[in-house]
Amino acid sequence: NLLLSLLPALSLSSCRKFRSDPEKITMRPRIFLEGAAPIPILDEYDVRLVQLGTIANIMTEEPNDRMFALWFSFDRRSAMTLQKETVRNVGKRLHLVIGGEIVGVHPIEGGITDGVLPFVLSANMPEENAVYLYNELSTSLVHIRAEFESKKG
């Protein structure tokens, strides 16, 4: 009986969707292929997750000198696009563009088959700027997905 009395509350809470707040969408990441038409090969609607991390800076002998990178994970369809474009364009670079500015670069060394694309941020980007970029992107992507889902119906 207790379970039956809770069913209406459970069904209402599971139907509630996260609402998009357009004011929280401050960044729309777009990915362009170097030297190609100025049309993004992937955009903010393709991204499922972004993560922040560090990588070794190969330009210095100092082992503690790290550079920040963003790892983008894509949905299945977009991962297939990413694989196709990276297989075709070995030796070129992908640019992460936000607000008209290139903020990250990925040199294409081979096909990316796992749907995860890392972008190295500028070597002189301070930690607080990298964290700010990550936080704004994360928040924006949550609201972009909610916006997309609400328009999809």
Label every PLM stretch briefly.
Residues 1-3:
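N-terminal export leaders
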Residues 15-153:
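Structural signature of multi-pass, alpha-helical inner-membrane proteins
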